[in-house]
């Protein structure tokens, strides 16, 4: 079945994986907070290096910069590799996502991946980014849970991609969605117990 075929050669696949992983593993949240004199972001809040935890430092601009850079590293990996074909973009995009989640420089303890997920989406299927944003915003308005909004948007995205003809890219995002949900398992437990912080609340 063509959907599951892989034509990119092994050397090229490995090169794309290495390229994507190196880009994705750059811990912008940690770098920016240290440069700003705010210390180690891993020692506050959730201990995460992503934008949500950077926001807990009280520096909104730094959190926004972290969000943007974490997304753009996924975009850069996927878009640049895609110059050699969609499979190259898929390999690099997946590796960038995994690099953010499991950076070798931080003992494989990284972020939860939503920003990089969006970045890879921008690199491989840019027309779907507004759909992701609309789903997230609608869910956030209704539930006021950032984590639940992300879980809903990531769950819908592989289906939307497949329905609009993205094929292999849809399979990539199905895999990334499963990983995203696993990385959010603590959030899911708090949502089920009613202890998850809502948007605008501290915690």
From Swiss-Prot:
Principal localisation: membrane
A biological process from GO: phospholipid biosynthetic process
Subcellular location: Cell inner membrane
Enzyme class: transferase
GO CC annotations, alphabetized: plasma membrane
Keywords assigned by UniProt, alphabetized: Cell inner membrane, Cell membrane, Lipid biosynthesis, Lipid metabolism, Membrane, Phospholipid biosynthesis, Phospholipid metabolism, Transferase, Transmembrane, Transmembrane helix
Keyword Transferase: yes
Membrane topology of this protein: Multi-pass membrane protein
GO molecular function: acyl-phosphate glycerol-3-phosphate acyltransferase activity
Involved pathway(s): Lipid metabolism; phospholipid metabolism
Superkingdom, taxonomy of origin: Bacteria
Listed EC numbers: 2.3.1.275
Entries under InterPro entries matching the protein: G3P_acylTferase_PlsY (IPR003811)
Membrane spanning stretches: 12-32, 66-86, 88-108, 118-138, 159-179
Reactions performed catalytically: an acyl phosphate + sn-glycerol 3-phosphate = a 1-acyl-sn-glycero-3-phosphate + phosphate
Family of this protein: Belongs to the PlsY family.
Role: Catalyzes the transfer of an acyl group from acyl-phosphate (acyl-PO(4)) to glycerol-3-phosphate (G3P) to form lysophosphatidic acid (LPA). This enzyme utilizes acyl-phosphate as fatty acyl donor, but not acyl-CoA or acyl-ACP.
Record text on subunit structure and interactions: Probably interacts with PlsX.
Name the record gives this protein: Glycerol-3-phosphate acyltransferase
Origin species: Sinorhizobium fredii (strain NBRC 101917 / NGR234)
Gene designation: plsY
